[in-house]
Amino acid sequence: MASTTASIDETRPGAWDVVARLGAVDGALAHPHATRLIQSAPAQRNLSDAVHALCDVYGRHPGMIDDALLRGAQLGSLPWLETAATGFAIERGYLAQLTAAVGPLPSTPGQAATEAALAGVRNALEILSGSERAGCATGAVAALLHDWAVTRDVLDLAATRFGIVAPPRALPPADVSAKALATLGATPGARRAITFGAQQLYAQHRGLWSLLEARASARGDL
């Protein structure tokens, strides 16, 4: 009798490897503004602006991971999503603490357009996490976890600057996500959906960092 368990093709990169490769090209680490914040001595207003924007997008509950868990479009992803949701609850609290510490949003031209853009990002994330296509939300969450390593570097820099003690990183480590996605992305259809979800998440992050870069330029802080 044929097995009902999808076999894993070990001759090609795993689904997590695909997510990581996409992130190397389109993720936060590839964006000049994110790397500028990490590698230089950024203006305090630029750090504050980044914290406020990230809290606006990811500081709300339920968030993208919670929505994906509730939807459960790919049942096999639920244990991994539960772990990710638990870890991200800590990140959400950290964002709230940082937002209070950095003070008011820096005065920047075009604030109304910024608010509309951030609302657009939140809406896009809701669509991804609520997708009924098995693997789409999985890919989006995987990309978020991969990209959050760099995002967390920015947050930790802000924490140091503003006198906040950063909590331990509690999101699933790369090897755990890689193992989960090896099974979740074993079929061609699921793999395509994971890739699509990751691509869309990175596109939203790229737009977010570009928005922050444009705001820094408008303030004369670049």
For the regions a language model picked out, list residue spans one by one.
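Terminal targeting/low-complexity segments that flank the catalytic cores of oxidoreductases
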Residues: 1-75, 146-222
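Active-site-proximal alpha-helical scaffolds that flank and shape metal-associated catalytic sites
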Residues: 76-173
